[in-house]
């Protein structure tokens, strides 16, 4: 059985970068970056660009916006303002606010980040948050999440069933380039 692999910079509230660009983030990480896993034989693997992105729980699309590596899909799970954000993806062209999704339904593919100056590997960024009830979806974007003061962020790892997660010290670029 394989396992997810996380480096400290991939985790919620980390101030560190985990990609070759290195250094510190300007703000604490708002979620979890997912891209590395073991193949069950002990080999380390990473997502290929274009891998399908399924949703973790049923919900309704309330917003789709650009982010710095692709696009982000905001999914409301209940009418209490609990939202998951799937970022750095290429969403299906049919996704629009109001679109209802079932658990496991594919919403898009991980964006190809090759050629970016920061050399960041293709990955899925997952944010879990609560927003004020009744907030219009068109107000949701990364500027709102990071600067409005109206968002409560949650650690995605505490909300996921993840018995096969492994935390590794250091950064990915340290393991690839000793």
Question: Predicted regions: what is each one?
Answer:
Residues 36, 63, 88-91, 112:
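A residue-level detector for short acidic-glycine micro-motifs
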Residues 29-33, 77, 88, 123-125:
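Histidine-centered active-site/metal-ligand motif
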Residues 70, 84, 121-123:
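Short edge beta-strand segments in beta-sheet-rich domains
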Residues 33, 74, 85, 109:
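Conserved beta-strand positions that form and line the central face of beta-propeller blades
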Residues 37-39, 78-80, 129-133:
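Solvent-exposed coil/turn segments that connect beta secondary-structure elements
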Residues 1-71, 103, 150-178:
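Surface-exposed, glycine-biased beta-strand/turn segments
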Residues 80-104:
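Short histidine-centered loop motifs in beta-beta connectors
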Residues 75, 99-175:
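Conserved, short, structured surface segments that act as functional micro-motifs
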